[in-house]
Amino acid sequence: MGGALRPARHRPHRRDRVCVCGRNAAGEFARSGGWGHLIDDGGSGYALGRDALAAVVRQWDGRGEATLLSELIPAQLGTRTPQELIAYVYGGDKSRVAALAPLAAQAAGQGDQAALRIYERGSAELTALVTAAADRLGLRVGEVALLGGLLSHDRYLREAFTADLARKAPGLRCVEPRQDAAAGAAMLALDMLREGQP
């Protein structure tokens, strides 16, 4: 194996960050992502939920196509008006938005084009994170361990990401993690501590 890359969704001191870390055979370390939802978090649960909300309001405005999400999200939240939806989203923390990601999966499972595009964007973001770290490490061949909640439990994101990565970086192969996400997060924290990264 030429090296290994780990998409790690959780860091011990921060919640819901998409971060890819890798190390090559020479022991060099590279990281991509982990910037948080206010800066850049493509492929995260928050991003999927935010994009699902955007699809709904675009339909309501007449700027976007009809989407099943405009039925699923208000039904899940018990909101009947745009004002109630706004109050829900802005009345809590970001976990409220991230909690909507499974509805994007539900809509994608029914062939909803807006939801499928949300997954295309999310998988492209994850692929870009992996290939950026791999490029900095000079890795053309290696393994990518799929760690974290979404990649473990969201079939659509996992399938879209693995297919996108296979097309764009055929030498990087997705593998099941050798340990659980908590162990991966601990390893990531140690790697970052050794490298002096925040």
Language-model segments: what does each one mean?
Residues 1-67:
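Phosphate-binding/catalytic loop of phosphoryl-transfer enzymes
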Residues 2-10, 53-198:
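ATP-binding/phosphotransfer module of carbohydrate and carboxylate kinases, centering on a glycine-rich
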